[in-house]
């Protein structure tokens, strides 16, 4: 985050926008100081842009993984309000882990670091060599298969526990099918979902 001061909050915001080359809509800020004395006024803001968050994420990932002796390249982009960062490396299997467990841990570390640094919960997704994208395609395919089974049998289907992002893909895919509804149940790593038939 960067800090800017001015006689008023608006003044500090204007300085930040000018310096960072962004519009006020692209600037996220919080007022850290505002005094209104008889002889002097002063305001201070701490601010950031999405581009600053992207740079922070890429730098943090590279630092963590290069310290662990991995050679990596990172590419980030923003889509639908979510920040995506893809890690390119020759050590995918090690960094992804069994069933993606290491990749989920990396995501958790990065999300927590971003929330702490920028004092806001932001949607962040870290992938390694397109693993999650391929995994989501498989999950979507499974969802269609499970949906057809429930439509045929009209019996509820309970799925094994899965990560939140994969459950989301399941929910979205089933929502495209008529006469079906989904529900998430359970807590933490045991959270699972059910698919039910509805008239």
Per-range role (PLM):
Residues 1-199:
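RNA-contacting regions in translation and RNA-metabolism proteins
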């Amino acid at each position: 985050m960067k800090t800017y001061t001015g006689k008023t909050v608006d003044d500090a915001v204007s300085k930040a926008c000018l310096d960072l080359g962004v519009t006020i809509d692209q600037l996220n800020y919080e007022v850290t100081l505002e005094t209104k004395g008889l002889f002097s006024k002063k305001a201070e803001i701490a601010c950031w842009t999405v581009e600053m968050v992207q740079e922070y994420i890429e730098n943090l990932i590279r630092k963590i993984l290069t310290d662990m002796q991995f050679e990596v390249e990172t590419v980030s982009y923003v889509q639908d309000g979510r920040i995506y960062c893809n890690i390119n490396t020759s050590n995918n299997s090690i960094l992804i882990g069994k069933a993606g467990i290491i990749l989920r841990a990396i995501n958790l570390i990065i999300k927590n670091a971003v929330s702490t640094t920028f004092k806001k919960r932001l949607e962040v997704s870290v992938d390694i060599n397109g693993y999650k994208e391929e995994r989501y395609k498989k999950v979507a395919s499974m969802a269609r298969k499970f949906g057809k089974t429930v439509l045929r049998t009209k019996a509820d289907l309970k799925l094994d526990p899965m990560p939140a992002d994969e459950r989301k893909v399941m929910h979205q895919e089933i929502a495209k099918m008529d006469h079906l509804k989904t529900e998430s149940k359970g807590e933490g790593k045991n959270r699972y979902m059910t698919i039910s038939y509805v008239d």
